[in-house]
Amino acid sequence: MKIVPLRSLPTLALATLLTALATGCASTEKKDPVLDEPADDDAQESVLPEEAETDEGVFHVHRHEEQLWFEIPAPLLGRDFLLVSRIARTPSDLGGGFFAAGHKTGEQVLRWERVGERVLLRKVSFRNVATGDDPIQVSVENNNFHPILAAFDVEEEGKLEGDPPTETVLIEVTDFFSKDIAAISGLSASMRKTHEVKRLDASRSFLNHAHAYPENVEVRQTLTFEAGNPPTDAATKTLSLEMNQSMILLPEEPMRPRFADHRVGWFTLQRTNYGLDAQKSATEELIRRWRLEPSDPEAYARGELVTPVEPIVWYLDPGTPAKWRSWVKRGVEDWQAAFESAGFKDAVLAKDPPTKEEDPDWSGEDVRYSMVRWAASEVRNAMGPSVSDPRSGEIIESDIVWYHNHMRSYRNRLMLETGAANPLARSLPIDEELLGEALRQVIAHEVGHALGLPHNMIASASYPVASLRDPAFARKMGVSASIMDYARQNYVAQPGDGLEGADFLRRIGPYDHYAIEWGYRVIPEAETPEDEKPVLDAWILAKADDPMYRFGAQTSSPTDPRSQTEDLGDDPVLASSLGLQNLERVAPKLLEWTASEGEGYGDLEELYGELVGQARRYLGHVVSLVGGVYEDLKATDQEGRVFTPVPKEEQQRAVAFLAERALATPTWLLDPEILRRISRGGEVDRVRSMQTRILHQLLDPARLRRLVEDELERGEEAYTLTELLADVQNAVWSVPSTPYSRGLQRAHVERLVWLATEESAGGVDLDTSDIRALARWQLERMKELLESQPDGLAPVLEAHAADLVARIEHALEERPD
């Protein structure tokens, strides 16, 4: 195409950037711009130097030395672009090490608009809308004015050859990409504070390249900041990173959205639709999903499996170690079976990226391509983020990240959770095939997120504990009805149960097939999202009575004992009992299993510390029964309650278990053969810390408030606050006196003092509740018992009693009734 300048405008300085934000990058073949001679004698020469290099794409990108211009076709003025900012190269430990190469730092919808001799860049929001032709649309627009992020002078007008020719405007965007624009710099306010970022050093910052593609523009920039506390090389006082800005043209016609339903788990976008006749400003939720359309709609309508017009493709990071590549690919493509439930075959693919010889312009930062990135980082994590069109929920792109050191997490947990029954997990390094299978399932979990699925924490509770010990069941069904649960390894299977290798691991389950079908199956007879609702609702009701198809969202403080993290099975007490039995078998073997000739005891110390944490986690699963409330998600046309308190008998059983396994001294954790190899001491504090955590969870104000409220409704059928306080006191004080038991008794008094003196905690008004009154009452009775101890006690016991009496008196005097 030729650029035909119509009229060059007086060159003005680039208008002030009003705030901060982003823009994109891209790539195709470079060529010198070909300019026709001006037809108008008054026309000035083009502002573009003859030496400028041009990339042709969604719009033209011109580059000369450190200057950058965008030539935007007039039809694209007013169109919506999605700008994605991503770290391309990063110093180690940026933001604590979580911000690896490929990490998305921002996304926003932008719109270019021409006003007179300037082009404005606006940030556009779709949070408030009015669908249809309702007159309120005018009010929505007037009350949701989009901010102007930057303004650019029109440097030149031109035309692109065509029939008819396309008018264009030329703007210089150099400053936008070379200055410190906070929203596209990759450094959040918290990171700037942490690393004491002072200013951008322009002399060490520059544009790497800019490329145009048919749908997007990509700009790569190197930014160097003066920083008082850089993440690495502190003496340099310098923080440098490479950012990639992707600006992709969104479809002119958005994908048909699908409305969310809280009974099926999906990541969602929320919008307030003022056009609905709901007698209120009604909130709508759209699920986030990829655009999957059948290549043969007629065959699809007949119920045949068909390929999608465009499959979902993830490319493997070229930096992925060779021995793990096949496992990563399998983790991606394991979702193919779930999409067959939605009527699609070969819907999800994993591919190697093209070589430089095959496609010199291919880039993993190009927003058109999704990747599974392998981050060389000490962080132990993985994640599956995605970028979506806020108008419809259509997922545009996703970069899954596996942090290299996450191998360490699974190496350790396979040994601790399965080593008792799994010979492949009894030495370091762990069997490579077993670790590869674990990697495969983690990748599948993160792909699930990238497909639109959130965590489903209730899924593991649908499997009976006994079934998890059955090799045939475990081999077919895994450990949970959904791979989106935090249920990683089968820790309940016992030696002799017969499970082998991958039988101990999770896998894509029946809920995942159901959720993918619910979100991705095309409903041919529906013409609008509203038309889909009765069909979607019928699919939910058809599964409503089967626990395998329940959804339980992840929360910071779950009250449903079935919706815990890292738990297994339908009986927390039994599952935790079996898990602890396995840990008791593993603990004395750690010295042998972690031994390596010529090495120290670093692995032993690490594994022992994580074993203690795993035991604490199992005990926490049981705590959740106390004051627990089952939550069964329903719509108004379904019978029954949503919230049901856990039966009294189950709560009493849980407290009895905790009295035996948590509040009694866990002597099995005190093996001197291990402790004297990793520590000079500190066992008493270690045990006290573990027991105190369980004690605090049991006597959590929100939990205690639920007990008070449950007694109001159920009376004698409820497990009461008075009963819990009595049961805990009996467990803590009815044991032989040792440094361990005395430490727990002090913790018990401290917790009661806290309940008796704090005004509020965790949203609970302690000052006016029965919790405070009963805590004070129990402290007073405890004081009487301590003061009535017989004479002749050992000095340490007498001192212990006197100390606790003094603590109680001080608390009650400082905060009298």
Regions picked out by a protein language model, each given a short descriptive name:
Residues K2-A13:
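Bacterial N-terminal signal peptides that target proteins for export
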Residues L14-T19:
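Hydrophobic helical h-region of N-terminal Sec-dependent signal peptides
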Residues L21-G24:
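C-terminal motif of bacterial Sec signal peptides marking the signal peptidase cleavage site
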Residues S27-T320, A338, A342, A347, ...:
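Auxiliary tRNA-acceptor-end handling modules of aminoacyl-tRNA synthetases
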Residues S326-E333, A337, E437, Q441, ...:
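Solvent-exposed, polar/charged alpha-helical surfaces in well-ordered, non-transmembrane soluble domains
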Residues E333-F344, G448-H449, L453, Q489, ...:
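Sec-exported extracytoplasmic/periplasmic mature domains
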Residues D352-A375, E437-Q494:
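The catalytic-center signature of Zn2+-dependent metalloproteases
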Residues S460-D817:
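Conserved catalytic/binding loops enriched for acidic/polar residues
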